[in-house]
Amino acid sequence: MGLLTVTGTPLPDPNDLDEDGDDAVRRSAGVGESSRASRHWWDRNADEYQDEHGEFLGDDRFTWCPEGLDEADARLLGDLAGRTVLEIGAGAAQCSRWLAARGARPVALDISYRQLQHSRRIDLARGAAPVPVVQADAAVLPFADAAFDLACSAYGAVPFSADTSALMREVHRVLRPGGRWVFSVTHPIRWAFPDEPGVEGLTAVSSYFDRTPYVEEDEQGHATYVEHHRTIGDRVRELVAAGFRLVDLVEPEWPEGHEQDWGGWSPLRGRLIPGTAIFVAERG
């Protein structure tokens, strides 16, 4: 499969990486620009992300969303023992470790080398066999046809890809017939609201139907972060066009007793409007 070996050398100092500005605009952003921005942003911010969210994510927890829905309870992937699983946008491969502990054979893919270094760091600290990892763009998967039984992504890759139709086709290509593809994204309705956890995040200020990307730029106007919006209907049509059958669409409710904010996700907003959409599809 062309698996990438990530060394156990110390992680580079974040101060050695370029500092990008964060002026936010709404404008078009193509495939190449989006991919470059995503790779650079995650390389630059992986340390902070893992430090801030590492306790919630754990080293080997499979959680689908800030609402805290775990695969152990949801069982959206079905039977795992002996199944080959591709985790897309894996970050530090926490989900893949959970899958491996249940008898699956996962491969963790991410566009960010720095995120994959964190995966290696966790493996070394645990003294466990390393999770196989691959650095690649999710829209150009470096695997043979029908290489996997299952594919999954917990908030990884899909929102950052400019051409998610191509991404869906690639996932379809590498899955075996009947293979399940499950991915979670920010619920599309959230696009209409400010990304704020408080009351200011409860008033719609943008059109749900405006698909213009959200782009953060540096002083030269180069994209440093890009996120793409699709409506629920867009996602369904992408899946069907790629050859999938939609099995379920899960909108996790905010659970009682869960009081932890995650960016714009909060108990206040989560109890009023959905924050996550999980698409469950099967390859035809």
Locations of regions flagged by a protein language model:
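A short acidic, Gly/Pro-enriched loop at the edge of an enzyme's catalytic core
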Residues: A139-L150
